[in-house]
Amino acid sequence: MITQKMKYALKALLELADEARRDSPQALTIEEIATRSGTPKRFLEHILLDLRKAGVVASIRGRSGGYSLLKAPRDVSISELVRRIDGPIAPLPCLSRSAYQPCDDCHDEAACRIRKVFAEVFWSYLVLIDSLTLEDMLAAGNPAAKLLED
């Protein structure tokens, strides 16, 4: 499950991506992003800082400053964002790529039936989320994209 913070980050990125597609894109202020996305401004400031540190958005100072998308939507990996914003995504610590820890109550990882079942579910999830980009999320809200698929 993704956190509310991650949902806010995705909403902000979708607004920035929509703005980047306009004929004359402008940097968006935190207020504009908050209004367009329905995200509380007080959370957005911290989230945009995290996204800037991750190299996904740029901040521009000055009168016409604000935030803009630094990468093309197809180059923004959703799984990398989830890990950056929410931390490890594995359902068990013994399945985590980045924060592996053996389970305290497990004596034999290779024979653990709980691990085996959740590993199968998790790997299926990883195949999907590792291939997901911001571009995919933009297309999900576009009725024309569905027509092109048929």
From Swiss-Prot:
For this protein, the record's Pfam families field holds: Rrf2
Q: Where is the HTH rrf2-type domain?
A: 1-139
**SUPFAM superfamilies (alphabetical):** Winged helix' DNA-binding domain
Keyword list (alphabetical) reads: DNA-binding
Q: Which GO terms describe its molecular function?
A: DNA binding; DNA-binding transcription factor activity
- Matches recorded under InterPro entries: TR_Rrf2-type_CS, Tscrpt_reg_Rrf2, WH-like_DNA-bd_sf, WH_DNA-bd_sf
| Transmembrane regions listed in the UniProt entry | none
PROSITE patterns from the UniProt entry: HTH_RRF2_1, HTH_RRF2_2
* GO cellular component: a single term: cytosol
Q: Which PANTHER family match?
A: HTH-TYPE TRANSCRIPTIONAL REGULATOR ISCR, WINGED HELIX-TURN-HELIX TRANSCRIPTIONAL REGULATOR, RRF2 FAMILY
What protein does this entry describe?
Putative HTH-type transcriptional regulator rrf2-like
Q: Which organism is it from?
A: Rhodobacter capsulatus (strain ATCC BAA-309 / NBRC 16581 / SB1003)
